[in-house]
Amino acid sequence: MAAEAKRTWPKRPIIYEINAWVWLNELSQRYDCPIKLDNVPSEEWDRLAEQGFDGIWLMGVWERSPAARAISLSTPAIVEECRRTLPDFSPEDVTGSPYSIHGYVADAHLGGRAGLAAARRALAARKLRLLLDFVPNHVAPDHPWVTEHSDYFVQGSQEDLGRDPASFLLASNGAVLARGRDPYFPAWPDTVQLNAFSPGLRNAAASTLKDIAAQCDGVRCDMAILLLNAVFTRTWRERAGAVPSSEYWREVIGEVRRQFPSFLFIAEAYWDLEWELQQKGFDFCYDKRLYDRLVHEGAGSVRGHLTADMGFQDRLIRFLENHDEPRSAATFPDAKGRAAAMVIMTTPGAKLLHEGQFDGARVKLSVHLGRRPPEPVNAEMRAFYRDLLRLVSEQQLLEGEWQLCDCQGWPDNRSNANLLAWCWTKGDQRSITVVNYSDSASQGMVRLPWRDLSSGAWKLSDDINRRIYEARDGNTLSTAGLYVSLPPWGYHFMRLEQVDAAAEDRRAA
């Protein structure tokens, strides 16, 4: 395992999120026997390895909280959501939120610590890395810290408890503690708020993370923004106490990295605080802004986003869905969804993909549930993602250099504004991606960055659409650009290769 801990991540990893509890439940049904992390059939690990991922995020492996589960079952809104999702819902389907953690040990239902170690070995044998959760902002009401280390938490008073019982709770040791929250929404009823300014809590968080780092290759840090000094002060004001001279994340990440230098930190980030979290030590931060642009805006907004500094973009993780967002198939019509996938998969940064996304799943599953309803598979979507992942992997695009391209139009045709275009270069390999991010047919001239195009002719192979285009004259490509005409939500994903003139002459003869 020591050797595994030293394995580094690629510069722009592709990560696949799996709901561990639900996945093992479905495998148990499929194989008609109890499946835990230590006896997942090898063909299931093989199936993951074949798809071109660099890491697997097993979401929700930590010990669930009995108290949190009871709160879930007694909260009408949660129960109603579960009933809408599962027509045959029963209370046994509720597992409690994986983000209300009872303890950072793999849940016995999933196979415990030994099962998690077996899963990591199985993944490592297939050159896959393991990503797990870390929830820095709060713990479950029955987490041992609540009674053993009340000083780790934001404190309240009896007056607070009487005035606002939804935001405070009485611990069994008599302490009044705040429930977890962010500055914009009511408190989460199944959580207790940790105090990011507590020196004891920071030490305990670093120790917890080092134990986690001994068991996996990285963590996705839930609501990481809430631990920033400025955000925590705005949320809790005088209850937070004196503002420390150092930031929580700089302190905690630095301590972990001293022992585990290659350990990966991903931040769930919002509110345009991605750059700030990157400066505190995070390898990647959620690119929620790009997601919102793809959902609600057009090509111009997306293009503007992609003009950001490359050092910033390369430390974003891009996605169309995850367990917090609606399913992409329910958000994007099929054609738009494929166009959006082309954008996130062929731009810089890490990629986050979600179990069920490739099959066109439409039901957003509550994190409180341990099973999901069956859904029909969208065979066209599955084939699209299979081909896209294969091509990105085969062409090793994410190891190269990326450049945004201009796309020009004509006085009487400004549809070029709908086109997004960029290039990748890796040694002699060149790739061009063009996406029509609109519901109208669009045309334009893509200006290519390569200075040596004028020497000879060039073949274009659009592998995602299984088309090979006639060779283009290099002088024209160099001066005027590449003419592109795409249907609504259409795309090209093309390799550019210089034609061997002598070989072409021999074939013609």
Predicted regions located by residue number:
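Active-site and adjacent substrate-binding regions of carbohydrate-active enzymes
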Residues: 2-509
